[in-house]
A protein has these predicted regions:
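HKD-type phospholipase D/PLD-like phosphodiesterase module
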Residues: 2-12, 34, 52-134
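Primarily the HKD phosphodiesterase
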Residues: 17-77, 178-186
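Signature of lipid phosphatidyltransferase scaffolds
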Residues: 102-186
Length: 186
């Protein structure tokens, strides 16, 4: 089910999406400057190797730091399981966690949240029987958006990747987190 939101309700939905991300968070925005509320919501996930953060930013080919500032980039680099991508043609804005997605006009930029007229469409990420029901009645906005933005991620340039490393235990039936290793840092 899709829901139209604007103003402070949009800010609340984005903050809620960050807070309630259990296993995965996708941030797609040309310009990113996190509000302190969003950083606070993510801090307890920094050292969780099961939590995957995927970030795509864009624009400003001559100086990428104008699209993603150094402070925010350093904040994201702390995550145990994170991939940061750059797409110079990016204009779309999409935020998603395990349960919901938000298609929005708003950059993830503190100024935009406080000063601009912005809107968003909040959708639920369907699974199981709900997904089957949506296929039957033809409502697939959330899944279409999820798939589209995953294809955008795949086509973007990977500029940073921190990957969790595990040790197999009990004949490979379980695994124990050891550390994270930076695979890409451009």
């Amino acid at each position: 089910m899709a829901k139209f939101v604007k103003g402070s309700e949009l800010n609340h939905e984005i903050d809620s999406l960050f807070e309630n991300a259990l296993n995965e968070l996708i941030i797609v925005s040309p310009f990113i400057k996190l509000h302190n509320r969003q950083k606070d919501a993510l801090r307890d996930k920094i050292k969780d190797p099961k939590f995957k953060l995927t970030l795509v930013f864009g624009k400003n080919e001559s100086d990428k730091r104008r699209s993603l500032g150094q402070d925010d980039f350093e904040f994201f680099k702390q995550f145990t399981n994170v991939q940061v991508y750059y797409e110079p043609r990016l204009h779309a804005k999409y935020y998603a966690n395990d349960d919901k997605g938000i298609l929005s006009s708003m950059n993830l930029y503190e100024y935009s949240q406080n000063n601009n007229i912005e809107f968003g469409i909040v959708t639920s990420i369907a699974s199981g029987l709900d997904r089957l029901k949506e296929k039957v009645i033809g409502i697939e906005l959330d899944n279409d958006a999820w798939q589209y933005f995953n294809s955008v991620i795949e086509r973007s340039e990977l500029v940073f990747h921190n990957e969790p490393l595990y040790e197999s235990n009990m004949l490979g039936l379980s695994k124990k987190y050891i550390r994270s290793e930076v695979r890409v840092d451009l």
